[in-house]
Amino acid sequence: MHVTQSSSAITPGQTAELYPGDIKSVLLTAEQIQARIAELGEQIGNDYRELSATTGQDLLMITVLKGAVLFVTDLARAIPVPTQFEFMAVSSYGSSTSSSGVVRILKDLDRDIHGRDVLIVEDVVDSGLTLSWLSRNLTSRNPRSLRVCTLLRKPDAVHANVEIAYVGFDIPNDFVVGYGLDYDERYRDLSYIGTLDPRVYQ
């Protein structure tokens, strides 16, 4: 689903009062996000139902902390096949708003993924550099299959050649926060996704 511009200005009744003046506009409402997650869950379930029945193993969803935690939780509930969770924490060197693609593992997986059907679940793919590194790293561990699902994708900023099987929304190259996405550990608690006023991070 393609989003061309911010969908609405902030209104007084929204949770923007948590951060007065910081949110420039709403890009995706909570209702839009949940509706799209339901569609993604159905699509993923259709793709993995037969695999799950054949292998007798649950779909393993791997998420990089912390941004995609809300998304992976809601997505798992929307997928009509059994799922399991694994988490990694990585540090990507670069500025506060962009990645260099140079990655250091802070927390690795707690289990072997050899022979498993793995779905990487991302919050947003912007440069694609960190995702490219993660895909190579996990592929080297010999999973049975490896696919990627992201809630948000910024096509104009993708420099790495990474195939993404499931995309929630294609969005502009705005700096966005909310629904798990942060700036300086703030704004994750918003139920919607909004664009951050540039004065906050400039």
Curated annotation (Swiss-Prot):
It catalyses: IMP + diphosphate = hypoxanthine + 5-phospho-alpha-D-ribose 1-diphosphate; GMP + diphosphate = guanine + 5-phospho-alpha-D-ribose 1-diphosphate. The active site is at D126. Diphosphate binds at K66, G67, R188. CDD domains: PRTases_typeI. It comes from the Bacteria. InterPro entries: HGPRT (IPR050408), Hxn_phspho_trans (IPR005904), PRibTrfase_dom (IPR000836), PRTase-like (IPR029057). It comes from Mycobacterium tuberculosis (strain CDC 1551 / Oshkosh). Purine salvage pathway enzyme that catalyzes the transfer of the ribosyl-5-phosphate group from 5-phospho-alpha-D-ribose 1-diphosphate (PRPP) to the N9 position of the 6-oxopurines hypoxanthine and guanine to form the corresponding ribonucleotides IMP (inosine 5'-monophosphate) and GMP (guanosine 5'-monophosphate), with the release of PPi. The gene is hpt. Its cofactor is Mg(2+). Belongs to the purine/pyrimidine phosphoribosyltransferase family. It is an enzyme of class 2 (transferase). One of its GO terms (biological process) is hypoxanthine metabolic process. This is Hypoxanthine-guanine phosphoribosyltransferase. GMP binds at K154, F175, V176, D182. Its main location: cytoplasm. Gene3D superfamilies: 3.40.50.2020. Mg(2+) binds at E122, D123.
